[in-house]
Each structure stands twice: as C-alpha cells, then as structure tokens.
A protein has these predicted regions:
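Structural/interface elements that position substrates and couple domains in central-metabolism enzymes
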Residues: 1-97
Length: 97
C-alpha cells in the first residue's frame, strides 16, 4: 500500500504501534510515527487489526482529518473493523474490503 501511494506522490504517515521503528526503516524504508503525528489527514487507511486500532471509534478517526469543513473525509477499512452501517452513518466516504 505504501509503495503504491508513493507512486502517486503521496507521502503517508505510517502508524504501527507493534512494529519496530528500526526494522520498518531498514526493511521497507518506512518511518513510523506516533498516533499524535497522524493529524490533518486527507485519508485514513486502517490496514491492520491491532487492538489499538480496534479501540478507535469512528469519532476518534474523524479527529485525524484536516479540520476544514470542505475537506472530504476518506476512510479505507482494509480489515473490516467497522460495520457498513456505522460507516454509512459516519458521513465519511469509505471503502471496505
């Protein structure tokens, strides 16, 4: 996912509390960030089902986006952590695998 995003000129902020920062950089060239660094997002991709991410409500996810009311909030729920009903009610544009 990260490599594909970079081909489009997107520089993702990657958060993975379980991964080793050193290993992520050495093996994949990916710098890991804390959740606090993941602010002002255009899009959020939940790609792993770690408990830290399962614990996030959709309201918590919404706080990660840019604060402008005009910006569309896009969520990719790769692991299907959220119900389709909750996603529809959230007002975010979403894709779910």
């Amino acid at each position: 996912i990260i490599k594909r995003l970079k081909t489009y000129g997107i520089d993702p902020v990657v958060v993975d509390p379980w991964a080793s920062e050193r290993d992520a950089m050495r093996e994949y060239g990916v710098q890991l960030h804390s959740m606090e660094d993941a602010k002002e997002a255009n899009c959020v991709i939940v790609a792993v089902a770690h408990n830290e991410f399962k614990a996030l409500s959709l309201d918590d996810i919404k706080k990660l986006y840019k604060s402008s009311a005009d910006d569309e909030k896009v969520l990719l729920d790769v692991k299907g952590l959220y119900t389709v009903r909750a996603l529809k009610e959230s007002g975010m544009r979403y894709w779910r695998l």
